[in-house]
Amino acid sequence: MTATAQQLEYLKNSIKSIQDYPKPGILFRDVTSLLEDPKAYALSIDLLVERYKNAGITKVVGTEARGFLFGAPVALGLGVGFVPVRKPGKLPRETISETYDLEYGTDQLEIHVDAIKPGDKVLVVDDLLATGGTIEATVKLIRRLGGEVTDAAFIINLFDLGGEQRLEKQGITSYSLVPFPGH
């Protein structure tokens, strides 16, 4: 099943745009409206599974929190394990962490040290690609554990915020179903 223009337009139309959220001047792309539409949600998962079904993926990693909503069903569809990457203090076993920059300050992500094995071929999944900082930190965690990651998949790409280019510099090919301008 290759995505048709009609299917991609359906997905795009299922994502509501909220003006001035979370602050004035921002046009927020609300993927939760896609989740409310079972046809759109299933289609988004099916299209990602179809794209990666023959890629030799052994693990899917999803970033907190909306990456879980797409990553886990993609992992099931591919017949592989799902690994959550979370904010500090949310994972019960031994973890490693990676700090990354935000617009105003820094944040941190963690992964269980035993979640990725050396040689695992990992697909990173998240709901949205903006600047790429969260995904870059996630990729660093996976690589520190010996995993191989060359691809990241998203529902939405805010194409003018530089995320694709940032990931390209890390050797990551990004794929998204729905492009939107970031402003």
Swiss-Prot record:
SUPFAM superfamilies linked to this entry: PRTase-like
GO BP field: adenine salvage; AMP salvage; purine ribonucleoside salvage
Entry keyword annotation includes Repeat: no
Gene Ontology MF terms: adenine binding; adenine phosphoribosyltransferase activity; AMP binding
Keyword Cytoplasm applies: yes
EC assignment: 2.4.2.7
Keywords for the protein's UniProt record, in alphabetical order: Cytoplasm, Glycosyltransferase, Purine salvage, Transferase
Pfam families the UniProt entry points to: Pribosyltran
Pathway terms, separated by semicolons: Purine metabolism; AMP biosynthesis via salvage pathway; AMP from adenine: step 1/1
Cellular localization per UniProt: Cytoplasm
A GO cellular-component term linked to this record: cytoplasm
Catalysis: reaction(s): AMP + diphosphate = 5-phospho-alpha-D-ribose 1-diphosphate + adenine
InterPro entries: Ade_phspho_trans (IPR005764), PRibTrfase_dom (IPR000836), PRTase-like (IPR029057), UPRTase/APRTase (IPR050054)
The organism's place on the tree of life at top rank: Bacteria
UniProt xrefs under PANTHER family: ADENINE PHOSPHORIBOSYLTRANSFERASE
Family per record: Belongs to the purine/pyrimidine phosphoribosyltransferase family.
NCBIfam families (UniProt xref): apt (TIGR01090), PRK02304.1-1 (NF002632), PRK02304.1-2 (NF002633), PRK02304.1-3 (NF002634), PRK02304.1-5 (NF002636)
Assembly, per entry: Homodimer.
Functional description taken from the UniProt entry: Catalyzes a salvage reaction resulting in the formation of AMP, that is energically less costly than de novo synthesis.
Protein name: Adenine phosphoribosyltransferase
Source organism of the structure: Escherichia fergusonii (strain ATCC 35469 / DSM 13698 / CCUG 18766 / IAM 14443 / JCM 21226 / LMG 7866 / NBRC 102419 / NCTC 12128 / CDC 0568-73)
Gene label: apt
